Every structure is written in C-alpha cells, then in structure tokens.
Amino acid sequence: MSTTKRCYYETLEVERNADDSTLKSAFRKLAMKWHPDRNPGDPQCEIKFKEINEAYEVLKDGDKRAAYDRYGHAAFEQGGFGGGAGFGAGFASSFSDIFEDLFGMAAQRGRGTGRERGADLRYNMEITLEDAFKGKTAQIEIPVSVTCEACSGTGAKAGTKPKTCSTCGGAGRVRQAQGFFTLERTCPSCQGRGQTIEDPCPSCTGSGRVTKERTLSVNIPQGVEDGTRIRLAGEGEAGLRGGPPGDLYIFLSLANHAIFQRDGADLHCRVPISMVTAALGGEFEVPTIDRGKTKVKVPSGTQTGRRFRIAGKGMPVLRSRQVGDMYVQVVVETPQNLTKKQQELLAEFEKLSSGETQPEAVGFFSKVKEFFGSRASAP
C-alpha cells in the first residue's frame, strides 16, 4: 500500500460521505484553481492538478469509490481494478466543461488568426483650475506604437507572408497527453499567434509595429475634477498582425491655485480684512474664477473665520448646467508696526472698552475666574 499518496477525499477537500454533486462541485473549483494554464511556470500546480484529477476519477465512479473505501490506494496498484487504465478516457468527458471555462476566452480572441488587440496607454496631464472652469482643447505629443507601413503590420518582409505554424496548424495552442489527462497549452513555436515569420520585416524586426511621435487633440470639458479620466478610443498602441488598436486614457490632475481651494463644485478662499473694517463693517472686493471681481459686505463686529457665500461663482458641474458657489472666509488682521500715535489711540480705546464691545473675551475670563475660584474653595 502506498505511503506517499494523499487521501483522495482530502485532495478534493470533501467529507467521506460527500454525494456526487458535492464531489463535482469541489472538483470543478479545484481544477479551475490549479490548472497549469492558470499558473504558468509553476511545476507544483501541475502535480496538484494531477492529484485532483486522479482523486475525482476514482471517487466519481461508484465501483472504484467502493474499492477505494475498502482497500485504499492499494485497490489500484499492481493492476488492481483495471490498473487505472480507464482514467484517460474518463478525463476527456469529465473535463469538457472545465476546458470550456478555461479556454473559452482564448477561442474568442480569434484563435489561429494571430491578431492581437493593441495595448491601452495612459497619459498624465496637469491642468489649471481656470482650464477646468472654462474647458479647453489641449495638444499633446506621445510616443506610440503604430502599424509598420513597410509590412502593413504583418511583420514579414515585403514580398513574403507569414506562414501557418506547422506545430499547431494555426490554432495557436497545442494539446499534450500526460498520462491519464491532456493539457492544452500555448504553442511554443508561434507563442499562440498561429503563424510564424521566416523572413522578418527589417523596419519593425517582425513585430508589425514601429514607435512614432503622435500629436493628438484632447478636448477637456468644463467642470472636470482632479482624477477625471478621458478616453480616446483607438489612440492606443496598434494591434498586432491586423488586430484592433488599444485606447488612450488621459488622467487629469489639477494644479494648486494661488487663491482658491476647490471642494467639488464649490470654491473657497481666505481674505484678510482690517481690524477697523471688522469692527465697523464695510465691504471689499474679491477676485472670481472667471477673472472678474465681486464685492463682499461685512457687518460690524465680524470675527475671524466668518464665511460669506457668493452664489453661482463656483465651478460648473461636469455635463450639467449646475454651478457651484464661492465661499469667502475673512481673517481679521492684527495691525503691526504701529506708530506712537496709533498706540496711544488703541490704549485709549482699551480704556473706553466695556463688556459689550468684547463679549467673548469677557465671557472667557469670567469662566477662568470661576474656575480658579472653585479650586481655591475646594477642601
């Protein structure tokens, strides 16, 4: 009896009383996970895959399962129970649906045609807040792979043509029998293209593409935000051997603005005002994103941090007629470098001040006095 083989039930990760439906479900899940084509270059996956196949071939058959439950792996050694000769045939039918799941995508890619879609490209573009407000058309230059004109994208030297791969017959994939199961792999001779090039084009060295600088116009709509993505269909890399081109994706980032901070469609700015304007009230002008100006009126007694809303002076909303607002936050600036006369006037003002002129300060110091008074009276 073998001492190296793992229990078939453990291999399929099921209980010994598992029914046929549970066995099949477990088998499909593990086969998809460990299939060598999904784990290229990993020999352990191939070993694991073989173990899964062997376990399922035994446990799905009522007679073989009964023999295994009674005698273990010894039931199939030294010719026992047919010497395991029936595994190969059973494999093909058991795995037909698995292969459809694994290789269905390959069939849709145009197996045997050799055509491949070009890669998508990414281009990072920084724009100003004004650009996002108004919208613009920008010109960009990018290096991109285009179809080689010398060979029309075939990769073969002028006057010659690619030949159908003799290894796979143009299918792009080959099947290889390994014991009781068959693996389908990418053809090693043509790398899945279905064609081979004996005399490559000297301009593109057989790739069918060359790199060139391309100038493109990018339409940036009003209201774009940081991180907005713009897709230019068909402006990516050229496809291989007549395949369709990829797409170009423009990723926008907004440069920091000297005056405004953006929050969605709203704009925010901080404006310093004099102590006199804050105390007596008044008005001042602020710039707007459309390079205009607007007036902001402040009431008397305005404190630092107060915000004023200016409706409709924010950013346009992308693909909408809506427009955000602009918020102006005032910062009361304390005067510096006072003259002697100014100092005297402020000192006189301080003497004339009462609790009504500085309610927050009076309230704060009253709380401080109360706090220390309560500590002094504590036992």
Curated annotation (Swiss-Prot):
Its cofactor is Zn(2+). Binds 2 Zn(2+) ions per monomer. One of its GO terms (biological process) is chaperone cofactor-dependent protein refolding. Zn(2+) 2 binds at residues 165, 168, 187, 190. A zinc finger (CR-type) spans 135-213. Homodimer. This is Chaperone protein DnaJ.
